[in-house]
């Protein structure tokens, strides 16, 4: 029987759908992605290259893994070497001249109409975290190659006003050697010679690992990988947002105005190893208990920095306010020795990841945290060592590049949707990107692409096919209007 309640529900639903269709283009975009209609018939939108082929390549690259059942592709692993060959083949298919440098970065270059002009660098990273999604990093590489291929197909590639170089960076995540930006850092010239001496958990040094992969490198040759700043015009990176903002506002693309600074610490706490059943609680020097207390202090400090730092003398009111909105802290890895259920650990090691837009505020947090870590160790009669594994200052994206990317994104979305009532959003990035390293070499700009649920560093990471298309079309528009 058809009830009055069902009738009312149907009427309300019909009104809502009619409202979406008539007055809110972003509503349609929010729920179902960009409506394509007859767009596939338009040659200037290159759906076969910028969407179909690009998506197929992302899925193909997503299967190149060192693990069975999940995606793991770390710095110059066997899977990474396969990815290098695959990416290089795609670059050559797009009309690019290719090579691989001594840090495992894949380069594809076209000189355009003026080979002596400053070059645009565009790219992202090909390595992944453990149990990764397939869009992080890879989307920026594939969208750049696809845009270049579209220009190659329509005969515009050699007419570029300046050289364009697509780069797939070998290591951004820093999974194996616990130090990020090995690939882009080499290009930017920010890696000290001692970088080659860094060891992984098996005590294999970077220089020996590179040699095993036929990339014999010395401190001198590492320095030679740095690009001459006078030869580079700028750097652009397309990347999934890794957050929920674009999905919430119903926009496929957004322009990044800045990237949070980041510090990685390694904390080692040493105590007295003993039998779990025979050492009285009052006589223990337990590094696990000390580490647990330190981690709780870290959480409190990062949740409420105003309570810890306002009267410290290190922070102004504006810095504390900035920290309250941007500070995030994470303990992502803990290990114990000897790691047995019936043994009081002799040593506990954990990592700390601290990020904030305000560099002075981030440094104040590190200062306060370090002070409290040592106080807890003294109180519990254990020893502590704090190592700084990585430091990267916050980066503000170039205003001119950002403006050009915003225009390119608007142009792409207008071609696909027909009408855009709202402005392309701008947002900050809490995640680190290769653009941070390259900012030491040249001006940088970034374009974010919406991802489902804001999920990243997870197999659940997902980007709509048409959003991949929008990213490629925006990149193409940017290249076509390159000054």
Swiss-Prot record:
Protein name per Swiss-Prot or TrEMBL: Allantoate deiminase 1
Activity regulation as described: Inhibited by borate, fluoride, L-Asn and L-Asp.
Gene3D superfamilies in UniProt: 3.30.70.360, Zn peptidases
EC nos: 3.5.3.9
Cellular localisation: Endoplasmic reticulum
Family, per entry: Belongs to the peptidase M20A family.
SUPFAM superfamilies with a match to the protein in the record: Bacterial exopeptidase dimerisation domain, Zn-dependent exopeptidases
Binding site for Mn(2+) 1: 125, 136, 239
Pfam families from the UniProt entry: M20_dimer, Peptidase_M20
Reported induction: Not regulated during water-deficit stress.
């Amino acid at each position: 029987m058809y009830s009055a309640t069902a009738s009312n529900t149907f009427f309300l639903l019909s009104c809502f759908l009619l409202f979406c269709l008539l007055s809110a283009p972003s509503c349609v975009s929010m729920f179902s992605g960009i409506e394509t209609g007859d767009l596939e018939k338009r040659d200037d939108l290159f759906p076969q290259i910028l969407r179909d082929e690009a998506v197929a390549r992302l899925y193909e690259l997503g299967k190149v893994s060192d693990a069975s059942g999940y995606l793991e592709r770390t710095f110059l692993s066997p899977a990474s070497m396969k990815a290098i060959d695959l990416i290089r083949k795609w670059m050559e298919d797009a009309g690019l001249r290719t090579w691989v440098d001594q840090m495992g970065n894949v380069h594809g270059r076209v000189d355009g109409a003026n080979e002596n002009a400053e070059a645009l660098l565009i790219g992202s990273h090909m390595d992944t975290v453990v149990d990764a999604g397939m869009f992080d990093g890879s989307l920026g590489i594939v969208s750049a190659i696809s845009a270049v291929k579209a220009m190659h197909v329509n005969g515009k590639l050699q007419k570029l006003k300046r050289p364009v170089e697509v780069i797939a960076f070998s290591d951004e995540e820093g999974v194996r050697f616990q130090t990020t930006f090995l690939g882009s850092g080499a290009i930017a010239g920010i890696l000290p010679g001692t970088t080659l001496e860094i060891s992984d958990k098996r005590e294999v040094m970077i220089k020996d690992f590179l040699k095993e992969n036929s990339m014999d490198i010395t401190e001198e040759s590492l320095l030679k990988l740095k690009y001459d700043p006078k030869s580079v015009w700028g750097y652009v990176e397309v990347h999934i947002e890794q957050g929920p903002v674009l999905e919430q506002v119903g926009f496929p693309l957004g322009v990044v105005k800045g990237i949070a600074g980041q510090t990685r610490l390694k904390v080692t706490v040493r105590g007295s190893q003993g039998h779990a059943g025979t050492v009285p609680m009052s006589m223990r020097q337990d590094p696990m208990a000390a580490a647990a207390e330190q981690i709780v202090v870290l959480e409190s400090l990062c949740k409420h920095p105003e309570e810890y730092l306002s009267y410290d003398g290190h922070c102004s009111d504006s810095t504390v306010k900035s920290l309250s909105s941007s500070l995030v802290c994470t303990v992502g890895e803990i290990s114990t020795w000897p790691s047995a259920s019936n043994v009081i650990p002799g040593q506990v090691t954990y990592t700390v990841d601290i990020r904030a837009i305000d560099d002075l505020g981030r440094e104040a947090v590190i200062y306060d945290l370090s002070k409290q870590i040592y106080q807890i160790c003294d109180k519990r009669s254990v020893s502590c060592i704090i190592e700084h594994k990585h430091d990267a200052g916050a980066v503000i994206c170039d205003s001119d590049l950002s403006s050009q990317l915003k225009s390119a994104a608007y142009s792409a979305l207008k071609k696909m949707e027909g009408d855009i009532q709202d402005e392309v959003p701008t947002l900050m990035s809490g995640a680190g990107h290769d653009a941070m390293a390259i900012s030491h070499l040249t001006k940088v700009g970034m374009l974010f692409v919406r991802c489902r649920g804001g999920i990243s560093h997870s197999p659940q990471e997902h980007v709509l096919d048409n959003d991949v298309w929008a990213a490629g079309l925006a990149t193409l528009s940017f290249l076509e209007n390159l000054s």
